[in-house]
């Protein structure tokens, strides 16, 4: 699943990503990603100082990105794209301790970012006429987490994309993000397709759960998945109190109830985590989950690259004809 929201308040964003708030950094340091990050010499772990600088529209050398003429866009310091693994994948990865599955999720996020960069656009004036230039680079920081707000196992990555990109003339400018958000459905499909291919290469079987390409691991049933969906049950109870089932509720009602019932994301110490994992393992045994699913041989790097390309092609093939034509024309 892919969700996203804009980061519009610089002061609030600074506290949101600080060690004090500890929302993104508490489960491990983030890593720099994207061709734009490479152009700025940003590699490896994310450091808080540079992270805040970039959110504020300043380059590592102190230069400030020129303000955009769009007042609304000027308030956007970046965007948080959150890629969440299917629940059964989270259960296999985090309770069984399957590092290969965790790595598959990370590679699928990278594939999605590579596709996002194809939609990176900046404004440029030529002879007094403003036009859009496809830049092909983004500056992003990826923070991988393992918990839902309800403390269920939930493997997900916050991909924070900064509001900047380098044009062909070497100048850094704010993003013109219309195409990026126009293709979020494609990005989510590409992530799911890549993840499915990587998991199949590991020997896991999957089952599709809808026509949009959502899937779960075949050896973990829906009933077993529900054992690790506390927040989902809270939402169901809230709907019952309103006299509705989930099927009858509108999307807005579901979103409002989800927000209203979302518990605070508290910090967890090492001991808390050990207790939590022990609890998960006990629940998985009670649910009858068998983690020792047979797996085939792991593919090499070349197979991974081919799987990534095939996954994106698969996602594109399932879009509308208009979207596919737009992508092919780039």
Language-model region placement:
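Intrinsically disordered, flexible peripheral segments
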Residues: 1-314, 319-323, 327-329
């Amino acid at each position: 699943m892919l969700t996203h929201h804009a980061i519009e308040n610089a002061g609030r964003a600074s506290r949101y990503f600080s060690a004090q708030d500890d929302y993104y950094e508490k489960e491990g340091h983030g890593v720099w990603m994207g061709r734009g990050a490479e152009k700025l010499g940003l590699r490896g772990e994310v450091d808080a100082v540079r992270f805040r600088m970039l959110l504020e529209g300043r380059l590592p050398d102190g230069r400030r990105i020129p303000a955009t003429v769009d007042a609304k866009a000027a308030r956007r310091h970046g965007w948080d794209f959150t890629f969440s693994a299917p629940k059964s994948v989270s259960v296999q990865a985090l309770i069984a301790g399957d590092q290969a599955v965790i790595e598959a999720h990370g590679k699928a996020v990278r594939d999605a970012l590579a596709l996002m960069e194809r939609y990176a656009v900046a404004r440029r004036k030529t002879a007094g006429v403003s036009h859009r230039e496809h830049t092909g680079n983004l500056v992003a920081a990826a923070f991988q987490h393992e918990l839902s707000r309800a403390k269920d196992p939930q493997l997900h990555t916050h991909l924070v994309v900064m509001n900047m990109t380098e044009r062909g003339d070497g100048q850094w400018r704010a993003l013109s993000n219309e195409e990026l958000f126009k293709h979020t459905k494609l990005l989510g499909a590409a992530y799911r397709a890549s993840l499915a291919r990587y998991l199949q290469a590991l020997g896991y079987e999957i089952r599709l759960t809808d026509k949009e390409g959502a899937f779960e691991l075949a050896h973990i049933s829906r009933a077993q998945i529900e054992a690790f969906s506390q927040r989902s049950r809270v939402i169901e109870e809230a709907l019952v109190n309103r006299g509705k089932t989930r099927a009858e509720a509108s999307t807005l009602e579901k979103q409002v109830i989800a927000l209203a019932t979302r518990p605070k994301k508290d910090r967890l110490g090492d001991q808390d985590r050990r207790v939590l994992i022990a609890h998960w393992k006990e629940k998985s045994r009670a649910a009858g989950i068998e983690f020792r699913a047979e797996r085939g041989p792991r593919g090499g790097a070349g197979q991974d690259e081919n799987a990534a390309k095939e996954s994106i092609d698969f996602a594109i093939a399932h879009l509308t004809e208009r979207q596919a034509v737009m992508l092919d024309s780039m």
